[in-house]
Amino acid sequence: MASLSPPESTHALNLEELRKPNITFWSVWDQDELMGCGALKELDGQHAEIKSMRTSTRHLRKGVAKRLLEHMLEEAKRRGYVRLSLETGSMEAFEPAKRLYAGLGFIECGPFANYVEDPYSVFMTKEL
């Protein structure tokens, strides 16, 4: 997805960032094949951010991202978060992701945490 946005508008976490203690990372496998992944980043005791949601091209439109996101929503509730937010791209390639998030109750919002307005970004949030 980095190829769709200029460097200053790319907010994906690298491997070192995924290892930080405020990040929980999940992956979905079918035997030895990676189907998808996603992360939850704690922003504070009540607010977390969905990060690094990806689905393998081979497994697109099979419900992998939805199942993973539903798991992350349940985990966020279990941890006591009252709000989840996310940043995704504004380009057409991100429309399926935006539909998925909207279908699970996320609504568009302004920038949160350290984000700023960006024509390449769409911000969404959900009260839990």
PLM features: what roles do these ranges have?
Residues 1-47, 51, 56, 69-70, ...:
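Acetyl-CoA-dependent GNAT
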Residues 55, 61-78, 99-103:
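Conserved acetyl-CoA-binding loop-helix of GNAT-fold acetyltransferases
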Residues 56, 89-91:
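Residue-level recognition of the GNAT/N-acetyltransferase active site
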Residues 66, 91-110, 117-119:
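Conserved active-site alpha-helix within GNAT-family acetyltransferase domains
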Residues 76-89:
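Conserved GNAT acetyl-CoA-binding A-motif
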Residues 88, 113-114, 118-128:
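Terminal substrate-recognition subdomain of acyl/acetyltransferases
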